[in-house]
Amino acid sequence: MDRNIENNNGKYFLEVRNITKMFGQFTALSDVSVGIKQGEFVSVLGPSGCGKTTLLRVIAGLEEQNSGSVWIGGRDVSREPVANRQLGIVFQSYALFPNINIIGNVQYGINRRQFSKEQRESRAMEMLELVGIEEQAHKYPAQLSGGQQQRVALARALAPSPSILLLDEPLSALDARVRVYLRAEIRRIQETLGVTTLMVTHDQEEALTMADRVVVIDEGKLMQYATPHELYVSPENTFVADFIGNMNFISDCTGRDPDSIFFGQYILQTLEGRAMNYQGRPVIVAIRPEDIRVIRDESVDYNILKTKVERIEFRGSLYTIRLRVLYEAGGATDQRLNMDLQVEAMESLNIRTQMELPIHLPPERLLLFKRQRGKS
């Protein structure tokens, strides 16, 4: 079994096992395995065209995989139709019926054979109250804002009490302020109901703020599956490091010994043993902009780089300082770094463009990655 679908008792409520999906000669998904616990909120994150929506559609039964299987509640549903999978689905386009009022739209997915009209109306109103738009029950979709329509689509998906909720970029068509509000609302509703949820998004902030764990996909391959914190502080490869947050990469490096790296004329200390596998080999060193420190005194005498300030960008709560690394003996290298400083720190340091600025790269903040042959 793939390491990403193992846990203490070996069971997940939703499991995707070794899924491969082809469209002709194009591989949309390649041997992807993911496990989701009951009640967990998981985001699938990646750039456009990476295969994340294809994964959701395979889980939903809207696309048939070429190989692999989908398990829900310990049952193989790989060949089951959509109707037998007990899913609620919210699409990016909302897919509301324009000629049916809001309460009618929400009722639509509730089984007419199992529930009376009164029961269906009661359940629909309960869901509208949950999403906070019960006062709009008798209006039509065209009379509602985009954010309200998205909440109707969510209420409709939840009305039949699905075992799993699938969200396909549900917030991408909304403006930024509404997106931020609905992020919190969707998570509140999910936690209230305890429904297992999988959300597809290309927005990293959306994924990191909403999900318990995040699946990162690129070119149809699973790049990492971890908590938002783990993705940010311990990315497993350069793709995840670059895609999640902002990252500086120093490519012209070679392993020196188990605890240090050559960067041109500089020696960079790492955590003990971190460089063990890179001795004499090319390596990429990475560090977050907020982890770079300005040298204020002589108390630090290692991992110091000479730099020149090329540009200062104000970004509200912080400044981003664009730096160019200098050789120890003088002259500029081709290496550039971004450093983030809070406004208070920036004001106290009096940093200006074109000034030389010594910086410190803390060993515990340096990440090391294998450099692919032919790549910088």
Feature names for model-found ranges:
Residues L45-P47:
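The feature captures the beta-strand-to-loop junction immediately N-terminal to the Walker
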Residues M247, R256-S376:
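Non-catalytic connector elements of ABC transporters
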Residues G68-D76:
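Conserved ABC transporter NBD signature motif
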Residues A60:
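Helix-to-loop junction immediately C-terminal to a conserved catalytic motif
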Residues F41, E80-G88, Q92-F239:
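ABC ATPase nucleotide-binding domains
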Residues T53-L56, V152:
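ABC ATPase nucleotide-binding domain helices that frame the ATP-binding cleft
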